[in-house]
């Protein structure tokens, strides 16, 4: 890339990843057009408008993935698009029409807007680890060449299945459109994103990441064999790939692998005020982690800066500051019950959300 500092578009700009990315881009000197579904929602836009540099280089634009063409105006004249927005409704009663269809059609609407603009040099799409490793027989390691088994996801309908399917199908559709229309398209594939955040509510990624603290057993299966990346590292990688002249294709963005046992020990050591469970029904004490390889990203010269401890320290302190989790004395959930599902191999990486 030629170092042009914008303007660039960030979709889903009020979300967990989107808002942090807007902050990082402003810090780097970019002019940013932030798209949100409802610019009148002060709770969503206030954290963005208060960022350093926002007064001079940030504008808020209305756009919705479910409305074809709604991104055209924001994208017109831009040099780059960071597509982060995605529907995330794990409780949807009609996932095909409420999650999968708007994700894929919204992706293609954005691709068409980029083609029409004629100024967009690169599109960076935030995909998910769920587009890579969801299959009947998990492997010990994955890289950017692996794809989830869509038929398996639709048949088994594990937690978050519609999110995994939507990301994989949107990514494939965008890659095909980019190839046919001469667009420069890159997808970055984060694993479970953990760290500090700007938004007011609890990000879905942290509902999962902090499940051992909150006692949310339904999310333990995801932590069984989990891969992690710090939010700040992810956003740095997104900007890095946007600017790197040789970047192309898919990139895993994952700095650490862990098991639920290792996370439980680490959290108990660092936060003894919480009663963290240490035993999990049906989970082998010698369980080995599953590795997600970021070699392709690292080979370009990128480096991760944060440890697993950094991720959780920042996430927990931010949640405490916002009153989203108690300061301590959380009763530990009993072993068994939903934990038995861990033995069935349901643990999968979810990745990022807006």
Swiss-Prot record:
Domain of life, source organism: Eukaryota
Name of a matching Pfam family: Epimerase
GO terms assigned for molecular function: dihydrokaempferol 4-reductase activity; flavanone 4-reductase activity
Binding site for NADP(+): 44, 163
The keyword Protein biosynthesis is assigned to this record: no
Reactions catalysed, as given in the entry: a (2R,3S,4S)-leucoanthocyanidin + NADP(+) = a (2R,3R)-dihydroflavonol + NADPH + H(+); (2S)-flavan-4-ol + NADP(+) = (2S)-flavanone + NADPH + H(+)
Annotated keywords: Flavonoid biosynthesis, NADP, Oxidoreductase
EC id: 1.1.1.219, 1.1.1.234
SUPFAM superfamilies with a match to the protein in the record: NAD(P)-binding Rossmann-fold domains (SSF51735)
Enzyme class: oxidoreductase
Gene3D superfamilies for the chain: NAD(P)-binding Rossmann-like Domain
Pathway: Pigment biosynthesis; anthocyanin biosynthesis
Keyword Endoplasmic reticulum: no
An example Gene Ontology biological process: anthocyanin-containing compound biosynthetic process
Record function comment: Bifunctional enzyme involved in flavonoid metabolism.
Family: Belongs to the NAD(P)-dependent epimerase/dehydratase family. Dihydroflavonol-4-reductase subfamily.
Record protein name field: Dihydroflavonol 4-reductase
Originating species: Hordeum vulgare
């Amino acid at each position: 890339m030629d170092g042009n500092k914008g303007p660039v578009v960030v979709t889903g700009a009020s979300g967990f990843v989107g808002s942090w990315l807007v902050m990082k881009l402003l810090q780097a000197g970019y002019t940013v057009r932030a798209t949100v579904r409802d610019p009148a929602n002060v709770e969503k836009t206030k954290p963005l408008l208060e960022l350093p540099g926002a007064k001079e280089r940030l504008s808020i634009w209305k756009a919705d993935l479910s409305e074809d063409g709604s991104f055209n105006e924001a994208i017109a004249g831009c040099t780059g698009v960071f597509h982060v927005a995605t529907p995330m409704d794990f409780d949807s009663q009609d996932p095909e029409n409420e999650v999968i269809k708007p994700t894929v059609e919204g992706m293609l609407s954005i691709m068409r807007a980029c083609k029409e603009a004629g100024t967009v040099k690169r599109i960076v799409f935030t995909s998910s680890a769920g587009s890579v490793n969801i299959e009947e027989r998990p492997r010990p390691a994955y890289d950017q060449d692996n794809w989830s088994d869509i038929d398996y996801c639709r048949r088994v309908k594990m937690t978050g299945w519609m999110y995994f399917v939507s990301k994989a199908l949107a990514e494939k559709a965008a890659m095909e459109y980019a190839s046919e229309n001469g667009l420069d398209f890159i997808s970055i594939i984060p694993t479970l994103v953990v760290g500090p955040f700007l938004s007011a509510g609890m990000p879905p990624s942290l509902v999962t990441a902090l499940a051992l603290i909150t006692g949310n057993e339904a999310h333990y299966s995801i932590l069984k064999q989990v891969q992690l990346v710090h939010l700040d590292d992810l956003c740095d990688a997104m900007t890095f790939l946007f600017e790197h002249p040789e970047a192309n294709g898919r990139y895993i963005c994952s700095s650490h692998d862990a098991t639920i046992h290792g996370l439980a020990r680490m959290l108990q050591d660092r936060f003894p005020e919480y009663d963290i469970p240490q035993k999990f029904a049906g989970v082998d004490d010698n369980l080995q982690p599953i590795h997600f390889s970021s070699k392709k990203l690292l080979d370009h010269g990128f480096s991760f800066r944060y440890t697993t401890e950094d991720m959780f320290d920042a996430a927990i302190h931010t949640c405490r500051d916002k009153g989203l989790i108690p300061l301590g004395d959380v009763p530990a959930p009993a072993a068994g019950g939903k934990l038995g599902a861990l033995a069935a191999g349901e643990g999968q990486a979810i990745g990022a959300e807006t």
